[in-house]
Design a protein with these regions (language model features):
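N-terminal amphipathic alpha-helix/helix-capping segment at the start of soluble metabolic enzymes
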Residues: 2-63
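Solvent-exposed alpha-helices and their adjacent loops that cap or buttress functional pockets
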Residues: 23-25, 96-97, 122-124, 146-148
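Structural preference for beta-strand elements that scaffold enzyme active sites
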Residues: 28-33, 73-79, 102-104, 126-130, ...
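Gly-rich Lys/Arg/Thr-decorated short loops/hinges at beta-loop-alpha junctions or inter-strand turns
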Residues: 36-50, 70-76, 95-98, 156-157
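Active-site beta-loop-alpha junctions enriched in small/polar residues
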Residues: 36-39, 81-85, 108-110, 134-136, ...
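Well-ordered, non-membrane alpha-helical segments in soluble/globular domains
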Residues: 51-66, 88-92, 166-175
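N-terminal active-site wall of soluble small-molecule enzyme domains
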Residues: 63-70, 76-124
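Conserved anion-binding
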Residues: 124-128, 134-175
């Protein structure tokens, strides 16, 4: 058996979001599957402004991801993409009915992401939600929204468009 030695500056910790554990030492926990639904151009979405979608097809996708999770032993997180807050509300209502685990909330629209935080708290989903993402593009208003709401899990996107690669990512994290 080949052993790979990892050395970390900081202690590796785990987090638990709605029963799914993330992090820790490499190999300590299984990889988490994150399947995206309702993304731009997704064939099941009929109107991405209003959140109209083919419910039966969406249910099949969530069921299939659940099956893959059982087959592989890897837990899964539902990654919900929404262009608008009204669409997100409909997608969250759907997710609450068909899925009991954690979900990632995502949008290319900064205002939708910020308003989503209030919506998640209002609907009581904050403890199941993972915000996507804190990045170099996060402005003060979005950061304030993160601090003022109950969602306490987020993805940090350490991408540096001015300096792609590990060194650039490290500079983003350090600054």
């Amino acid at each position: 058996r080949n052993e790979i030695m990892f050395r970390f500056k900081n202690e590796q910790t785990t987090v638990n979001v709605a029963g799914v554990r993330f992090g820790g030492q490499p190999g300590e926990l299984p990889t988490v599957l994150c399947g995206t639904i309702f993304y731009q151009g997704h064939r099941i979405v009929e109107d991405d402004e209003r959140g109209i979608f083919d419910r039966a097809a969406a249910e099949r996708l969530v069921l299939r991801q659940s099956e893959l999770s059982s087959e592989t032993g890897c837990p899964f997180v539902l990654h919900i993409y929404a262009r608008t807050v009204p669409a997100l509300r409909k997608y969250l209502d759907f997710a609450e009915e068909v899925w009991s685990g954690p979900f990632i909330v995502d949008s290319a629209e900064r205002s939708t992401r910020s308003l989503a935080l209030s919506l998640l708290s209002e609907l009581g989903y904050a403890d199941k939600a993972i915000y996507n993402s804190i990045s170099i593009a996060t402005d003060d208003a979005e950061a304030r929204a993160l601090l003022e709401n109950e969602v306490d899990s987020a993805i940090i996107l350490a991408y540096n468009p001015g300096e792609p690669g590990v060194e650039g990512a490290m500079r983003i994290l350090e600054n």
